[in-house]
Amino acid sequence: MAKYSHFLPLFLALLFAPDLGAQTYYRSEEPHCTAPKDSTTLLGLDIVGEGFFRNDEYASDLVADYTLPGYRLRANLSYRPETRLPIELRLGVYNLYYWGATRYPAALAYQDLPYWRGDGDRYTRLRLLPYFQASIQPAAGWAILLGHLQGGAKHRLIEPLYNPELNLTADPEMGLQIRYEGQRTRLDTWVDWQSFIFRGDKHQEAFVFGLSTAQAFDFSPTDRLELQLQAVAHHRGGVLNERADTVHTWLNAALGAVYSHRFALPKHPLTLQAGLYGLAYSQRGEHYASDKGWGFLATAGLSWRRWQTELSHFYGYDFISPLGIPFAQSIGRAGRSHLLTHHPRYTAWQGSYRIIESEAYTFGVSGGLYIHPHSAHSISSFIEAYLSISPRFTLLHRRGR
């Protein structure tokens, strides 16, 4: 019994909470880039501070246990001139800090370290990056971004394609993004350029292409069916790349349908969602031990006010996703050249509660329990507290406003 004692607080929290759910609160107070701009502000100051404390109790043959205590901070000036088409320029700095850390790998992006981003022996005392974003809204519901993108949880990717924990660890995405938000249609496509190379550099050129789109069909005021297509493609290499065995391309895609029904309760509606996805994986470059794979994901969830809960089940065959959660992978800690299993599978129960949510801040807690029989230790869990504060200050008003 002592072996599982550290799961007891998490189990009780999941059991006695009205509803708990997936982690959808990351920067939830931040409006989508397609939302109408403030028509009165000419020059503003934006501050986005995210404090987090997350503890992962993971199966040792999949990924090591660890704790993430720290913050992400962004401060930028925003300039919104009065033009026929709304445009905005943001300039600032971004900082990632882990409590107790005294040095950080001097890589360009914090994913898959230290295989290709950096030489492995270069460090910096402070993780500070420039922030730049230029955006335009060419039509209602449309936005085009150059520079830093609106990424992470805003892409709405499923967990086998994108690990929610990257909202706390990955650097901001940079490149080009085109986004549309309509009443029934959603489109988000982007290129995240993670690594640029000059001749003689030891690391690779690398970028990620992503697509997240959905089309909804309303059968009644309370019933909706949404068809979704999601894809993430990674490429590493480049014409100037001089390293051997470092040109690779991976593609992950998912096609799914999500049904939702809203129950009209006296004060606040209760929403039920059920989804089914088919997933595919393909590789060029012989980096991983599997070239092709597939999987299925089934989800069911409830949301009520600021509470959410989700139950999901995944089953795959030789499936690998570079950005996905570790429990959906056919590989483990033994390395990329060795398949831990041909059949990765897990059942997950997750929940979150937005304790406070407003236009300027979000305070939430979440927890999750994973059961993965393909691992020697079949139970993993996490628990997390998250506080995001995003004040915006007007420095100059437009004339006549």
Give names to the regions the model predicted:
Residues 84-137, 159-160:
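Surface-exposed loop and membrane-interface regions of Gram-negative outer-membrane beta-barrel proteins
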Residues 59-63, 115-120, 161-164, 194-200, ...:
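Extracellular loop and loop/strand-boundary signature of outer-membrane beta-barrel proteins
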Residues 1-29, 178, 381-395, 400-401:
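Bacterial Sec-dependent N-terminal signal peptides
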Residues 24, 48-52, 70, 131, ...:
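Exposed, low-structure sequence patches enriched in small/polar residues
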Residues 33-57, 87-89, 274-276:
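Transmembrane beta-strand segments of Gram-negative outer membrane beta-barrel proteins
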Residues 143-214:
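Surface-exposed coil loops of outer-membrane beta-barrel proteins
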Residues 76-97, 179-190, 269, 275:
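Surface-exposed extracellular loop regions of Gram-negative outer-membrane beta-barrel proteins
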Residues 50-72, 104-106:
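Surface-exposed strand-loop-strand hairpins of Gram-negative outer-membrane beta-barrel proteins
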